C-alpha cells in the first residue's frame, strides 16, 4: 500500500456501514482504517440545517482540508446533495479548486449524479475534470450488471473497448463480465 493515505467524505455512509460494505466485497480494510491510512468523514449530520450558506461552508471546509492535509487521495461521495442547496457557481468553484489541488500532486475522486445538473452546467463540470467515468446499470439477459464507461481521461488516447461490465457478489467481490458475454 506504500503508506498511501485516503480521506473519504461521505454523505451516504457511516463508518460502520462503510467497513461492512467493503467487507461484503471481500475487501477487508479495517486494519488500514484502524491505523489511520483511511479516514472517513461523515457529511450527513442529524438535525443539520441544509441551507445555501451551510453548504458553501461545508464545500469550503472540505477543499481546505484536502489542500492542507497529508492525504494522498480524497474521495467525495457524493457531491450531488450539495448541488441541491448551493449555486452552480459554488459547485464549479469547488471543482476548479479541486483541480488546482490535483495539479499539485493529490488525487481527488468525486462522485455525482448527472441528473443534479442542467446540460449546460454538466458540460462545464466535464470540462473542468481530468477524467469522466460513467457508471450505469444495464439489463443483460435476465440480470442486471454494472457497466463502467470511460468517457474522458485527459492526456489519454481514445481507444475502442472503453466499457467494463461487472457484477458485485457479496462475499466474493467484483466479477468482470467478458466483453463477448456482455455484448450478447
Language model regions located:
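Phosphate-binding/switch region of NTP-binding enzymes
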Residues: 112-173
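Phosphate-binding/switch loop-helix module in NTP-utilizing enzymes
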Residues: 43-103
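Alpha-helical scaffold elements adjacent to nucleotide-binding pockets in ATP/GTP-utilizing enzyme cores
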Residues: 17, 21-22, 94-97, 124-128, ...
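Conserved catalytic network of the ASCE P-loop NTPase/AAA+ motor domain
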Residues: 1-2, 30-33, 64-69, 100-105, ...
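Loop/turn-to-beta-strand initiation segments
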Residues: 5, 36-37, 70-73, 104-112
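Conserved P-loop
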Residues: 1-46
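NTP-binding/hydrolysis catalytic cores, primarily Walker-type P-loop NTPases
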Residues: 69, 163-184
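Short, ordered loop/turn segments at secondary-structure junctions
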Residues: 11-14, 45, 78-81, 113-115, ...
Amino acid at each position: 500500500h506504500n503508506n498511501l493515505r485516503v480521506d473519504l467524505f461521505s454523505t451516504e455512509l457511516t463508518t460502520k456501514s462503510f467497513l461492512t460494505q467493503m467487507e461484503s466485497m471481500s475487501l477487508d480494510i479495517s486494519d488500514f482504517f484502524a491505523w489511520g491510512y483511511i479516514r472517513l468523514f461523515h457529511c450527513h449530520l442529524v438535525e443539520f440545517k441544509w441551507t445555501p450558506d451551510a453548504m458553501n461552508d461545508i464545500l469550503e471546509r472540505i477543499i481546505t482540508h484536502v489542500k492542507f492535509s497529508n492525504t494522498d487521495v480524497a474521495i467525495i461521495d457524493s457531491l450531488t446533495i450539495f448541488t441541491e442547496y448551493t449555486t452552480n457557481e459554488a459547485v464549479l468553484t469547488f471543482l476548479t479548486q479541486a483541480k488546482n489541488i490535483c495539479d499539485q500532486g493529490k488525487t481527488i475522486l468525486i462522485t455525482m449524479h448527472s441528473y443534479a445538473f442542467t446540460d449546460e452546467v454538466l458540460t462545464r463540470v466535464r470540462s473542468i475534470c481530468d477524467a469522466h467515468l460513467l457508471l450505469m446499470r444495464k439489463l443483460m439477459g435476465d440480470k442486471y450488471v454494472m457497466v463502467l464507461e470511460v468517457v474522458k481521461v485527459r492526456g489519454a488516447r481514445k481507444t475502442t473497448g472503453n466499457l467494463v461490465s461487472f457484477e458485485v457478489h457479496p462475499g466474493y467481490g467484483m466479477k468482470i463480465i467478458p466483453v463477448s458475454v456482455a455484448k450478447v
